[in-house]
């Protein structure tokens, strides 16, 4: 039985770090790693949307992950997003992530074309096979990927024992409940994790069953999300809602720009 408690909590999406010339800043990545560890984050999600994964060369993604791991290994949970717009690069990044010692790899589905479910499953399973000793997280973000995680596809992926979680960034919190129920049905209580993705609904996702959150603004205001998580764990829902409301107003202002 896997111990998945290392994934339960507040996991900031790690930001892309560049120097003044637009190159990957390893020193910036190391500094951000140390900062977020000091703040009390449960882990990091490296190379995802906030890490500008789709815009980076695989070598840049490797370089940033190596910088993070040089500071984080053995101290904090690290999930590396390895999805690319082709299987070969995705597989290469998966193998690299395992070689540097991440806790899990993750991936969005193939983007642009709406591929059949068997093709999406093969894409994910090929990555997982390239990192056979590393756990796998499905990243569901249909509004950007163009393809959503269906229950039939999730059930197919649950045949892979390394698939231990879904990061759910769709807006309906009902999806969290459905994915969680499917995971429990297949694996048993405590053996499947669902992350809340949308920052503006952290509390609502946790209340309906998410084990933690994985979001893009956690790294700039971690204290609020850590407080919300603590409130939710103690069923202090009024306090949690108050912080959530404040954070949501900040997000709405950011989105107005």
Where are these regions (language model features)?
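Polar low-complexity intrinsically disordered regions
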Residues: 1, 13, 99, 233-242
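A general structural signal for stabilizing positions within well-ordered secondary structure
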Residues: 1, 35, 96-97, 157, ...
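Active-site beta->alpha loop and helix N-cap motifs at the rims of alpha/beta catalytic domains
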Residues: 2-148
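Short amphipathic alpha-helical segments at helix boundaries and their inter-helical linkers
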Residues: 43, 256-257
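Catalytic alpha/beta core domains of metabolic enzymes, predominantly
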Residues: 129-130, 142-256
């Amino acid at each position: 039985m896997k111990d998945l408690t290392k994934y339960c909590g507040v996991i900031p999406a790690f930001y892309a770090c560049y120097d003044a010339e637009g190159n990957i800043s390893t020193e910036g990545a190391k500094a951000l790693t140390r900062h977020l560890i000091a703040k009390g984050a449960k882990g990091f999600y490296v190379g995802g949307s906030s890490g500008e994964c789709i815009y980076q060369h695989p070598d840049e993604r490797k370089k940033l992950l190596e910088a993070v791991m040089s500071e984080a290994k053995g101290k904090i949970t690290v999930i590396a997003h390895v999805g690319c717009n082709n299987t070969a690069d995705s597989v290469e990044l998966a193998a690299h992530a395992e070689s540097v010692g991440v806790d899990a790899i993750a991936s969005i589905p193939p983007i642009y074309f709406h591929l059949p479910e068997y093709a999406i499953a093969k894409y994910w399973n090929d990555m997982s096979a390239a990192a056979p000793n590393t756990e796998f997280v499905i990243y569901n973000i249909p509004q950007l990927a163009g393809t959503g995680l269906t229950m039939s596809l999730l059930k197919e992926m649950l045949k892979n024992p390394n698939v231990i979680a879904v990061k759910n960034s769709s807006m309906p919190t009902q999806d969290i409940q459905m994915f969680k129920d499917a995971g429990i049905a297949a694996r048993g209580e405590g053996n499947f994790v669902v992350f809340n993705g949308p920052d503006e609904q952290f509390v609502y996702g946790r209340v309906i069953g998410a084990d933690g959150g994985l979001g893009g603004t956690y790294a700039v205001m971690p204290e609020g999300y850590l407080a919300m998580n603590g409130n939710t764990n103690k069923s202090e829902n009024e306090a949690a809602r108050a912080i959530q409301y404040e954070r949501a107003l900040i997000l709405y202002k950011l989105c107005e720009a």
